[in-house]
Structure formats: structure tokens, C-alpha cells
């Protein structure tokens, strides 16, 4: 077996020391939290737990990369393939739900109850058990582990695993054939997905027509490939100093729902928010593509802000106004203190074939004059954009995001925007009087840029 070079040994030693220190810190922190009143646990305490957990996982990933070789990589891939197949098999026969939540049962009784051959069941249990999923506390006897029990109490976890086995994996394996046949096509029916299923229907249409598939896709996006939900992004944005704005107006541009606005309105009672819905650049792959019924009640097809129906006076809803506005239309609100601009995460296949980056550049250019006149601020949520290569402390987080990006390509010939492309677009946004500049980057505990703060800067 090839050895590790001297610089590799130094890195290995440093990672092992960091891992040891972080594990001790994590254990000490968790003990402090568990010994205190859980109801009084602060958000900072939970954030610190997440941070130390991420550091531990990053160190483990780095150590594996330093020690691993071709054999270790192939063995790990072979194991993961079979784990995915086993999860699909367990879901097909609803075996997890048959195992008592407390205690366990004999494998033979479980096989009889599920109607499967006991020899197959035993093999599956013993493989997934190597990953802490189910256990055999005594020969031929099975019980849940804390990990496997969660797949019974939360159907969404199992939905994600089933989608991975039934669609994500087969589709990914058809990528070479799709490239041979379709080249660089962006048409939504010329994809690896269409070849894998031998179907002419776009994936985006399939998840709209089949609710179960749509549910599984949403679960896969959020649990397996790290798509940040709007509530989580809103939690991150809440770290900004919104209370300093007083009774100012905030305009959310290019929104797909009102969830972020309501979150901010609930948390900051002096804010007034105008939500500008833009479905023209929405992707059908977005789980929020179908409009919630409560949002439709307040949606109008003109550009005059309309409050949502029958809000209680003084409530958060009374301070949230919903309008419809596409990116190509002039911004009617030119005196807001803050504009939250949602850039199109996906390079959607629009009828006109418009490029997402050109849309972003045009919209950024439009805000030059507005920000110059008002000294306002432009916020761009970026949690779901692809991070700069190598910029995150945990490489697994970047791997998860890039897995999601390839899923979009293989399923629908779509793709996510790179942070580097957005930085380039901002850098070139200027006119004869000034330019847009980034004044702050709000980052998560792993170094992910979740929001950019921009303002207009006049030339000296």
C-alpha cells in the first residue's frame, strides 16, 4: 500500500489533534446543555453545537481523504450502492414499521409478518447494521437503533431514500448515454431521466401530476441534497439589524412565496414588507412551484400593493402586502429602505431561452439608480447558490450542493448558479456615476455565504 508523504503526515497529525479537541468540546457542550433546562436553551447554544459537529465531520472527511486510496474509495462506493438498495427494499415491504419501537423481535417472525424470505431479510439487516441502521442485539433477533427509528416516525426521511433509489441513482447512471445522444441540449425532455424511464414527459411535469413523486422529490431536496428552505434562510437573515430600520418599507423581489416576509414581520413588529411574486422565472423543480392557497387570496395581477385578505389590525399579516411583478417590469417601489432580491437559482428553460445570468445582470443594473437616490440597501440571499470551490470548512457541504446541481442537470437539464458568477455580475454593475459594491457577507458556521449586502458607491 502506498505510504503518505511527509506533508500528508503533518496534515494527518494536525487533523487528529483538531478532531480530538473538538470532540472533547462537543461532549462538554452537550453535557452542559442536557443538564440545563431544555426550554431555556439559547439559539447560540444550538448554533455552537452545530458548529462543533460540522468541525468534527469535516475533520473525519479530511482524515479519510488523507488515508484513503483507490481500494477504499471503491469499497465505500460499493457499500453505499447496497445500502441504498437495502433501504428501498425495506421501504417496499414496510419492514421498518413492523419492528416494535421498543424491544425487538425475531428475524423469522419479522420475515413472516412482512412476507419476505428470511434469508434475504437477515442479509439486509446485517448490512445496514454496519451503518448503525437497525441492529441484531442477539443472533437472529432485530431491533431499531435511534437512527432507524427516525425513519418510522418521520415518513419524509424514507421518501428521500426511496427517491434516491428509484430515480436519482438510475438517472445519474444514464448521464453518459444522455451525453452521447443529446450532447449539450437544454431541452427538458432530452435528459438522462427520460432515458432512464424511457419517457417523453419532462420531470418537472411528472412531479406536478404525481403528488407522491412530488412529495418524495421535495424530501430528497431538503434531506439528501441540502436545499435550504425559506424559513431557514429567513432565520439566517434575522441576524441582520432589522430593528434599526424602524417603520421602513422592505421590498422582497422575485419571491416564490410569502413565508420569508411573514417570518420577518413576526420577528420585527415595525417592519412593513411588500412581496413581489415572480412566477415567470420559477422552475417547476422548485417544491414551492405550486402557490399556497392562502397566498392566492392576496395575489393581484397589477402593480398596486394589496394587503392579504382580512388581516387582523396590528398583526404581522397586516404589514405584509403581496403583488405580482416580473423581472422585466419597472420597479414601482422606489423609496424602500431595503430590497431583498431573489436571483433565479436555476437556469430555467424559458420559452425565450433567456439566460439566467443576463436576467440577473439586467436587474442589478436597474437597482443602481434606485439605491443611488435612496441610499438604500440591496440584500441577495445566496444560501442555495453553489459555493466557491474549496471555500467551505467542511467539504461534504460543497459535495452535497454539487450533487444537487448534477441532479437538476440529469433530471431536467437545469443547473444552479455559481457564487463566482454572481460575484462577477455584481462587479461589472456600474454606470457613469457609480457602481454596486458588496459591503457585507453573512456567513453560516461552515463558511457558507447565505446573504450579500450591497449598496451604491459613487465614484470619487
Curated annotation (Swiss-Prot):
Q: List the disulfide bonds.
A: none
Q: Which UniProt keywords apply?
A: DNA-binding, Nucleus, Transcription, Transcription regulation
Entry-linked InterPro entries: SAM-dependent_MTases_sf, WH-like_DNA-bd_sf, WH_DNA-bd_sf
Which parts of this chain are annotated as the region Disordered?
300-320
Q: What is its main location?
A: nucleus
Compartments, as annotated in UniProt? Nucleus
Q: How is it used?
A: Notoamides have been shown to exhibit antitumoral activities. Notoamides A-C show moderate cytotoxicity against HeLa and L1210 cells with IC(50) values in the range of 22-52 mg/ml, but the IC(50) value of notoamide D is greater than 100 mg/ml. Moreover, notoamide C induces G2/M-cell cycle arrest at a concentration of 6.3 mg/ml.
Q: Which residues bind DNA?
A: 107-126
HTH iclR-type domain location is: 74-145
Q: Which GO terms describe its cellular component?
A: nucleus
Domain of life according to the entry: Eukaryota
Keyword match Zinc: no
Entry GO MF terms: DNA binding
Q: What does this protein do?
A: Transcription factor that probably regulates the expression of the gene cluster that mediates the biosynthesis of notoamide, a fungal indole alkaloid that belongs to a family of natural products containing a characteristic bicyclo[2.2.2]diazaoctane core.
Q: What is this protein called?
A: Notoamide biosynthesis cluster transcriptional coactivator notR
Write down the species. Aspergillus sp. (strain MF297-2)
